[in-house]
C-alpha cells in the first residue's frame, strides 16, 4: 500500500505541517489544556514539524479539490486549541505539497507524570488539523523516570 499511496499536505508553509504528541494516560496536562478523552482535544505535551520532505507543489484551488476538502476536513481547522493562544493558526492556503516520509527522533524534555499510571498507555500523534496522523506509520514514546526533588517522595 505504501507504493500506491500519494500523501498530500495542504499547509500555509508549503509542507511544514506540525505533529502534536499526546500521552493522555501518563503525563499531567499542561496548564493551558484541559483533560479530555476526545482525540481531537487531547492535551498536547510536545510539538514538532511533521517528518516529511516536500518534493513538489501544486495549487489546489480547483473546484474539484475544494469540494473534496469541504467534505473530508473537520470543522475545527481554524481554532484547534481554543484555550491556548499560542497554537491558534490562520486558515490553510491553497498550496499543497507532495511529500516523502523521513524517520525522526525527538526529545520533549522533562514532563510531570501522573500520580497513578495504568499499565497500558496511549501514544497519539495528531496532525495540524487534530486528526490522528495518517502520515506516520510507526510511533513510540519512551519515558525515562527521573526524580527532580525530595518533594516527589
Curated annotation (Swiss-Prot):
Coiled-coil ranges per UniProt: none
One GO CC annotation: T=25 icosahedral viral capsid
Keywords assigned by UniProt, alphabetized: Capsid protein, Host nucleus, Host-virus interaction, Late protein, T=25 icosahedral capsid protein, Viral attachment to host cell, Viral penetration into host cytoplasm, Virion, Virus endocytosis by host, Virus entry into host cell
Top-level taxon: Viruses
Induction trigger: Expressed in the late phase of the viral replicative cycle.
Subcellular location: Virion; Host nucleus
Main location as per UniProt: virion
InterPro entries: Adeno_Penton_B
GO biological process, one term: endocytosis involved in viral entry into host cell
Misc. remarks from the entry: All late proteins expressed from the major late promoter are produced by alternative splicing and alternative polyadenylation of the same gene giving rise to non-overlapping ORFs. A leader sequence is present in the N-terminus of all these mRNAs and is recognized by the viral shutoff protein to provide expression although conventional translation via ribosome scanning from the cap has been shut off in the host cell.
Function as written in the Swiss-Prot or TrEMBL entry: Major capsid protein that self-associates to form penton base pentamers, each in the shape of a pentagon, situated at the 12 vertices of the pseudo T=25 capsid. Involved in virus secondary attachment to host cell after initial attachment by the fiber protein, and in endocytosis of virions. As the virus enters the host cell, penton proteins are shed concomitant with virion acidification in the endosome.
Family classification: Belongs to the adenoviridae penton family.
Subunit annotation: Interacts with the fiber protein (via N-terminal tail region). Interacts with the capsid vertex protein; this interaction binds the penton base to neighboring peripentonal hexons.
Name this protein carries in UniProt: Penton protein
Amino acid at each position: 500500500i505504501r507504493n500506491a499511496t500519494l500523501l498530500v499536505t495542504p499547509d500555509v508553509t508549503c509542507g511544514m505541517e506540525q505533529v502534536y504528541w499526546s500521552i493522555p494516560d501518563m503525563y499531567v496536562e499542561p496548564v493551558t489544556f484541559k483533560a479530555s478523552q476526545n482525540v481531537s482535544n487531547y492535551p498536547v505535551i510536545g510539538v514538532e514539524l511533521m517528518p516529511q520532505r516536500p518534493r513538489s507543489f501544486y495549487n489546489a484551488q480547483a473546484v474539484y479539490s475544494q469540494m473534496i476538502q469541504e467534505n473530508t476536513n473537520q470543522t475545527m481547522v481554524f481554532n484547534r486549541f481554543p484555550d491556548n493562544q499560542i497554537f491558534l493558526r490562520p486558515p490553510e492556503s491553497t498550496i499543497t505539497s507532495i511529500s516523502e516520509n523521513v524517520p525522526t527522533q525527538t526529545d520533549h524534555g522533562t514532563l510531570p507524570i501522573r500520580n497513578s499510571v495504568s499499565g497500558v498507555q496511549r501514544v497519539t500523534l495528531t496532525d495540524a488539523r487534530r486528526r490522528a496522523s495518517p502520515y506516520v506509520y510507526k510511533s513510540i514514546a519512551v519515558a525515562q523516570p527521573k526524580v527532580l526533588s525530595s518533594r516527589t517522595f
